[in-house]
Amino acid sequence: MAAVSLSVSTVKPLGDRVFVKVSESEEKTAGGILLPDTAKEKPQVGEVAQVGPGKRNEDGSRQAPEVGVGDKVLYSKYAGTDIKLGSDEYVLLSEKDILAVVN
């Protein structure tokens, strides 16, 4: 089996799925105490890196996604599948798990 090199440009979400680059979590508290990885909360904000073609309707047509590449989004805390590419963290989630677009 041939090895596949993954990068953001090679990942194309299917259906209504969205590939989001996770924002960095806080490294220390407001009081200056450094947090270990086990104490950090899972981030819920990220930037859309790739978008699928949209959900398929009953008549076979596609419903265009409401978010686009570059949008900053807020998503459900435990939604999606975590993926690490190099040193960057991503989450692949369904569009319904996106709660809001953040300006």
From Swiss-Prot:
The keyword rRNA processing does not apply. One of its GO terms (cellular component) is cytoplasm. SMART domains: Cpn10. GO terms for molecular function: ATP binding; metal ion binding; protein folding chaperone; protein-folding chaperone binding; unfolded protein binding. It holds the Pfam family Cpn10. Its main location: cytoplasm. It is found in: Cytoplasm. Keywords: Chaperone, Cytoplasm. CDD domains: cpn10. InterPro entries: Chaperonin_GroES, Chaperonin_GroES_sf, Chaprnonin_Cpn10_CS, GroES-like_sf. PANTHER family: 10 KDA HEAT SHOCK PROTEIN, CO-CHAPERONIN GROES. NCBIfam families: PRK00364.1-6 (NF001530), PRK00364.2-2 (NF001531), PRK00364.2-4 (NF001533), PRK00364.2-5 (NF001534). Together with the chaperonin GroEL, plays an essential role in assisting protein folding. The GroEL-GroES system forms a nano-cage that allows encapsulation of the non-native substrate proteins and provides a physical environment optimized to promote and accelerate protein folding. GroES binds to the apical surface of the GroEL ring, thereby capping the opening of the GroEL channel. Heptamer of 7 subunits arranged in a ring. Interacts with the chaperonin GroEL. This is Co-chaperonin GroES. It comes from Prochlorococcus marinus (strain MIT 9211). The gene is groES.
